[in-house]
């Protein structure tokens, strides 16, 4: 049987009891419609994933016991997505898909052609957690504060992949496979493309 997953940013261990935060009470009771003795999966990136059984549900509290470890924590390859700040719905979709595909760090970029200069990091984190729960990952990507493209390029020493639609293809991604042992960063520009002066 496949159980619902919940990301918890707390220490997890077999046979331990865990009190879930108030935010989860509504979600577990009303959205998932779980009751006492029902099971769910609880996970985080540092301890892994555990099968948990609900032992108590109150108006504002919910307790579970972690029965058994289902997955051990693991280290993912470093894969950064530096994405221009675009319209909210499109940015959320990009963040969701990037999370499901295994991106480990997301950096919102401020470019000359950006329509927006700020981003709601808390909202992005909620999107990342939901996508992590759906995609069977253990580690949600880290979301950094927005930075200008110029500053990002100055401080970055990763291998950067960038598709320039105005240039003829010089190298296929298959030809650079020998470089893929390095940390990789992918840059996605705004809808109008990146200006090299950015």
From Swiss-Prot:
InterPro entries: Alpha/beta_knot_MTases, PUA-like_sf, RsmE, RsmE_MTase_dom, RsmE_PUA-like, tRNA_m1G_MTases_N. One of its GO terms (biological process) is rRNA base methylation. The keyword Transport does not apply. GO terms for cellular component: cytoplasm. Keywords: Cytoplasm, Methyltransferase, rRNA processing, S-adenosyl-L-methionine, Transferase. Pfam families: Methyltrans_RNA, PUA_4. It is found in: Cytoplasm. This is Ribosomal RNA small subunit methyltransferase E. It comes from Rickettsia prowazekii (strain Madrid E). The lineage of its organism: Bacteria, Pseudomonadati, Pseudomonadota, Alphaproteobacteria, Rickettsiales. The gene is rsmE.
